[in-house]
Each structure stands twice: as C-alpha cells, then as structure tokens.
Amino acid sequence: MKRVAILGSTGSIGVQALDVVGRFPDRFEVVGLAAGRNAPRLLEQIRRFRPRVVSVCDEAAARAVRAEAPPGTEVLSGDAGAVAVASHPDAAFVLAAISGGAGLRSTAAAIEAGKPVGLANKESMVLAGELLMARAAAKGVPILPVDSEHSAIHQSLVGHNRGEVRRLILTASGGPLRCTPEAELATVTPERALKHPNWSMGDKITIDSATLMNKGLEVIEARWLFGVEQQRIDIVVHPESVVHSMVEYVDGSIVAQLGISDMRGPISYAMGHPERMPLDLPPLDLGRLGKLTFEPPDPARFPAYTLAYRALELGGTAPAVLSGADEAAVAAFLARRCSFTGIAEVCADVLEAHVVEPVRSVEQALAASEHGRREAEKRVGARAHAPAGR
C-alpha cells in the first residue's frame, strides 16, 4: 500500500490521478490533498478518499471546507497548507500538479522532505529546475515526470546508457490551430483556441499548446530533468499524439513510447513506478490508425516555443521570467484583453528586457516569475491603449 499526497487535486491532472487511485484501492491510500478554491469538488474527494489533511488556497475556502468536512480531517490553507500536505510524514509519494508557479514551494518542500515526486507541474522545473534537481540528487529523491512527453522520454531511457544519447525529440500535437493560416491567428478567439483535438487539459495549458509555448516550456523541463543541453532537444509536430516522445542514440537508433491520448497512462506510470499497473483503457490499434505523420514546427506562425530556447541561452532567471510573462499573457487572452498572437509578442518583449541573475533560491525564482507577470501585464495594458495603427 503506497500512501500518496496529491497537490492540485481538483484540477485536470489531480482528478485523473484520483481516478487511478480509485481503480487500485489495494495499492494506494490518499493521506493528503491540496486544492485551489473548488471547495465542492474537494469535499467530494474528501468524502470518497478520507485524507488525513487537506489544504485550499485561502482561508475563506478553508472555512467552507471545514464546515462540511468529516470529523478528523485537518483543513489548512495557503502556501503553508500546501507545503504541509507535500511534506506530510505519512506520505510516501507526492504528485505535484498545482498549475503554474504556485506549485513551486510545495514541490520543493516534498523534495526537501525526501518524498519521491511525480511531477506534473512543469513550471517548477522552468522556474528552478537546476536548483530542484540538485536538491533531489542531494536527498536521493527520484523525480518521475507526469507530462506525457517526459514520461515517454523516461520510459525510452530505461535500460540504456545515458551517455549514448544523441538527442531528445519532444512531440507536439500542433494544437487546435495547427492548420490555421498565419493571417487569421491574430483574430483567433479563446473558444477556438481551447478546442484541443486530442487531449483533455486545463485552460492555461490548452492555450499554451495552441501557441506552442507549452512545448517550449517542456524543452526547459527536459533540459533539467534529463541533464541534456537544449541544443540536443528537438521538437517535431505529430498531429495524432500517438508517439509521445523519442530518444535518439548515438548509433542512429530511435526509441519511442506510443500510447493513446489519456493522461492516466503517464500518471499511473509515475505513481506505480517501478511497477506497471493494468489500466482498463482502450488499446492502441495501429492497424486501424493507418499512419503516423510528422512535420517540423513553424516558428513564423508559432514563435512562442523559440522563446524557451532563448531563455535557456540567457540562463539564470530568464526562464522564470518567461513563465510568469506567459501566465499573465494567457490570462489576458482568455479575458479578451490580448490577441492570440500578442501572447508571444508580449512574452518576447518581457524576456529581452529582463536583466538576468543567477537563481540561488526558490524565493528568488518566484520573485523572477512575479516580475515577468507584472511586466507582461504592463505591456498588455499598454497595447490595449496604444493608438490605432501603431
């Protein structure tokens, strides 16, 4: 029986992780849950899984949960609450799935507490990947990726000598706008950009998929998770989302992981590692699928992913600033205050204006991300009030 804590339990990944837990009640026990403000969903999870401790993002939500939670459930709030769940002494595994930079402190706390981490919060690696991997190595803590691409790379590295890796190849679906002409992208609506053809995800990551910023952030994540320089990490667009990523070795051989587009696959791989669990999911029928297609990404239409390579080149706080700027720009797009193409333009402006510093602490990384967010919000506001034709 593995005792688990799930951070971000009411989000897309958290809900699917609890679905996996529910399928294997003899393998997992939930000891802690951390959520945002969705008190009704958290209460449903509490009643079903009976965790010992839960946390929500603020005290108002905590009061609502305390009023209805079963006796014996400790209800905490804020960053301190999420950190307490992540470092709970009874947790033997922590699934880190809080979206955005908000998940960094709790992910770092799990590592410091010596907990194996299933990492679904890529922003933690983007903001402070070098720092977190150094602490994980010092603590002897395994970090198992939950992103489908990084899970695929992890699986494709098993049994191989990492010194023989030539490059990592991250696949991208291309998102809902892959075939949209460049001239139409500026007028794309949030509703259209949110219609992902293959994956069921939260709004922010779905927009990042549409801009290809998500793939750029995954390049940064892969840089630190696998210790491979960005010059040896490539992106290929693969619309079917069947090949989840690949590893090319020095002899030219390519090892890939294939599967259906269902996040419960990589979630169960991380949670059950080193064992695989028999999931009752539809099989991948390659004969019926017929073909797999691949194409290079188009930096002219989707320049956002190139900013991640630029951020790694700049180093230090640059990736954290880019991540914060992207969070603000995506939020502005969803609120109809920024155009679709404006997301990458705002992020590029913020990144190039940033004065880079080395990342020495989690708090410094968070401050850099917040700086990126503020600078992006300023630019969104300035663009909204710019004279027509400017």
Curated annotation (Swiss-Prot):
Alphabetic keyword roster: Isoprene biosynthesis, Manganese, Metal-binding, NADP, Oxidoreductase
SUPFAM superfamilies: 1-deoxy-D-xylulose-5-phosphate reductoisomerase, C-terminal domain, Glyceraldehyde-3-phosphate dehydrogenase-like, C-terminal domain, NAD(P)-binding Rossmann-fold domains
One Pfam entry name: DXPR_C
The protein's required cofactors: Mg(2+); Mn(2+)
Enzyme class label: oxidoreductase
Residues the entry annotates as binding Mn(2+): D147, E149, E218
Pathway participation: Isoprenoid biosynthesis; isopentenyl diphosphate biosynthesis via DXP pathway; isopentenyl diphosphate from 1-deoxy-D-xylulose 5-phosphate: step 1/6
Family: Belongs to the DXR family.
HAMAP family named among the record's database cross-references: DXP_reductoisom
Annotated protein name in UniProt: 1-deoxy-D-xylulose 5-phosphate reductoisomerase
Organism in which the protein naturally occurs: Anaeromyxobacter sp. (strain K)
The gene coding this protein: dxr
